[in-house]
Amino acid sequence: RHSFPTRRSSDLTSSEQQKQLPLIYPLLISLLSGAVFSFALAPYYYWWLALLSPALLYACLRKRSARQAFGIGWAYGFGLWFVGAFWLYTSIHVYGDTGAALSVVMIVIMALAMGLFTAVQTWLYRRFFPETPLTFAPLWIIFEWAKTWVFTGFPWLFAGYAFTERYLDSYAPLFGVFGVSFAVILLACALVEILNRRWFWAIPSALLVLGAWGAGFIQFVQPKASKPLSVSLIQGNIPQDLKWLTEYQIKTLEIYVNLSRTEWGRDLIVWPESSIPLFQTDIEPFLDAMNAQAKKTGTAWVTGIPYWDLPESKREGQPMYYNSIMALGDESEGLYKKQRLVPFGEYIPLSGMLSWVLPALQNDPSVSGFSRGASDQKPLLIKKHDLGSAICYEVAYPNLTRRNARQSDFLVTVSNDAWFTGTAGPWQHLQMVQMRAKENGRWFIRATNTGVTAFIDHNGHIVKQAPIDRKAVLRGELPAMQGETLYMRLSDWPVLGFSALLLLLGWFLALRANRPLAAGLLAGAALTVEIPVGAMLGLTGGIFYLAAWRRDGKPQAFLRF
């Protein structure tokens, strides 16, 4: 019974409430805990903070009322988003022509709004569920998932990203970033329970670690027999304050043409997002010349370009503008229109109310004029291969990238992170690309304006990386992959379904708080799934480790599904 506290906040006695620390202490601890969480992510990589931060929040909620839990969660969420997403300040202040004080105020408002996710999460936790990691962790995952779609979504600062290229990321090909987050949060809460001498929690913790070890030996994909493509990624380093100026447009094209001059003859050349700062109809002679040059040299050319057309829509006669990727050249064709747009980067939420605050952004076609592309777009055709596409912010959406990856041999993302240069934003962005590559078992090439331009393999490792904030050409090989990861097939539903089941059982447990059978039901249901899965993954890892050992001491094995 001690391992599974079952009382809700309303059940606390007056003596227990008197023993609690004043509310100001958990509020401050939660605020600081949320603030330090982002240092677990790129570019700092203090991964252990991703365990410590939620562990402190979990501890602060112990025996607190639902109302107090709301405030504690809001403090945590505010600290998390104010520090973790402060890189938005550069976009709003430097490139949005907004005063410094007002820019900070806007970041505060954003952090307060996003912090409500955690506030509602912790309120629900203390109002309807028993105090146990088996309800805290599922609620955390449900609210991470909600951030991918509520108000178009802002899917940033997930716990699972802290373990990119670290031990627990072996769960990514199985269950995606939410599966990694679930493991992180459950381990964090279990640590608190173990420190409180609830030794039972050593069992699920050990199973999670064992399962991660075994999952690391499972290979869902393997390279195709075809020869890898030779690829050149072009990084133009165009200053954002000059990029859309009419007098600088030709200079921008000259920079990219000159950087590409020695790359013709390679299989693929990739220019970054909106590297052509003109609509396709305004620059047709240039596109025709580049297409002819690419075909002449046997090269495929992929470039970011703003695109407009007149689709059938309710706004009859009104052109629709898109942030897009275009493929031209030898054995290459296709057009991809961006589906997910960046708030304050490509469109302005509540633009009618905020236009007086952000006059410069309203006049920038890269910000205020773009529409969303269709969800059923085909991959680009490159040298008889299918190239899945993602533009900038889209790689933050796991399921969107998964859909594109299912029909692709490899993936490309183009981006312009000059909006956030000199901040943690571009590095957090790159870390997400690494997780998407790991989830889907596909190589990812990333071409950016100012960085970070990189080649990322199907295991999420950075193979090559260009220096940031300078002109560069990054050359590498791009192998086509075949096969599907479990995550690619099943999406987020296994993790979301398991989380929903635990919450349903936890709610039932809270209603029947005085019945030992109900407490055992929650523990038993969780372990019924976790024990065989953890044991299976651990056993699989052991078999692979022993049976596939080679002279160099590195196990190589493939498990085909």
Where does each model-flagged region fall?
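Hydrophobic alpha-helical transmembrane segments in integral membrane proteins
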Residues: 206-241
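Short, small-residue-biased leader/transition segments that mark boundaries at the very start
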Residues: 2-9
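Solvent-exposed soluble domains appended to multi-pass membrane proteins
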Residues: 251-254, 269-504, 513
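Acidic/histidine-rich helix-loop elements
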Residues: 91, 239-253, 352
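Short, conserved active-site loops that position catalytic residues or coordinate cofactors/metal ions
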Residues: 41-56, 80-87, 235-237, 265-278, ...
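A short, well-ordered alpha-helical element
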Residues: 254-265
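Membrane-embedded alpha-helical bundles of multi-pass enzymes
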Residues: 13-220, 422, 433-436, 448-456, ...
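Transmembrane catalytic cores of multi-pass membrane glycosyltransferases
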Residues: 531-561
